[in-house]
Amino acid sequence: MLPSHIKLSSSLTCRLVGGLTREQRSVCNEAPDTVAIAFEGLQLAVKECQHQFRWHRWNCSSLLVKSSNPHASSIMKRGFRESSFLYALSAAGVAHSVARACAQGRLLSCGCDPLGYRASHDPRGRARANKWEWSGCSHNLAYGIEFSKKFLDVREQVDDLQSKINVHNNNAGRSVSFVRNLLRLLSSEEEFI
């Protein structure tokens, strides 16, 4: 993996990352900034996998491949239970990172989710019925989920049973509740960092 302080040109980014299919390289050439953020999401998925399996015999260490693409590792090419979890976690990580980058204004292709509202509260802290106030820029979760689908599902072949299982696991990871829980979990961890 490249040091985080090195910024790569878009064409170089797409050429240096190993394990991409021709279709993913095409997506990379169309939106290199978003793909770079997607790889941050994949690395986030690897870290979360290591955290979840830290006390198990298999602890995601095989995902630490020379490229920044955990999908290039051998475990992701097989139908193990762990790889099912990793597909879901990867899809959620990409959706999370892209949604967050949208909210931070780091991507040209998207912006804030216009639904950045929160319930208005009275002086005692109770939510007022049907009263909303603007709370700033929220994560553009819909864009993150769509990009995750566009970038990760394109590597799967239509007729292959394992590919259908992988897409199913990707969809499970992209379920809104899963991604929102990941957002909440990671946001709370950042407060302590």
Residue ranges and their predicted role:
Residues 1-193:
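Long, position-biased, composition-driven segments near the start of the mature protein
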